[in-house]
Design a protein with these regions (language model features):
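Terminal-region recognition feature
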Residues: 1-163
Length: 163
């Protein structure tokens, strides 16, 4: 008897989530560790209370099909979500250097914008764990626009929430 279509879809979703947990290639992971650096998820796990992290947009991938970027790893190079520090809710993003050198592209920026907006809307601290190469030049001006959105949100949050 064949699996139920829903079971197949849930299995596919689980495989995608597992792939997202290990988005960067093994050689990039090894280079980070050889430099004594933690990976993006390791930094989040180290910073937040154990088991408190809730990830947002884990399966997001870039849309820059015309840019020549063939690889489309999940997370698009940034992990976003919320958790707690000593029981207090905080929002966090952590750039993943193993995916495109942690360079900011359009979807990457949208994920940061979203988590920053959520932090501001609930009055919770916003934590950025940065380890990136700057703008993803292959995506052109949309990368720079992404930085503009981050800076604008920094200004809007200034004096309102810790960041």
């Amino acid at each position: 008897m064949a699996d139920h279509p829903m079971t197949e879809r849930l299995d596919d979703l689980q495989k995608r989530k597992e792939a997202a947990l290990h988005a960067g290639p093994e050689r990039a992971v090894q280079r980070q560790h050889d430099k004594g650096k933690m990976l993006a998820r390791e930094r989040i796990d180290y910073f937040l209370d154990p088991g408190s992290f809730h990830e947002l947009d884990m399966l997001a991938r870039h849309r820059a099909h015309e840019s020549g970027i063939v690889e489309r790893p999940y997370t698009d190079g940034v992990i976003t979500g919320w958790g707690t520090v000593e029981g207090r809710k905080v929002f966090v993003y952590s750039q993943d250097f193993t995916v495109f050198g942690g360079a900011l592209g359009e979807v990457f920026a949208e994920k940061i914008h979203k988590v920053m907006d959520l932090a501001l809307s609930v009055g919770a601290p916003m934590i950025g764990l940065n380890d990136g190469a700057g703008a993803r030049i292959q995506e052109g001006v949309v990368s720079l626009d992404g930085y503009g959105g981050i800076f604008w949100r920094n200004v809007q949050s200034s004096g309102v929430i810790p960041q």
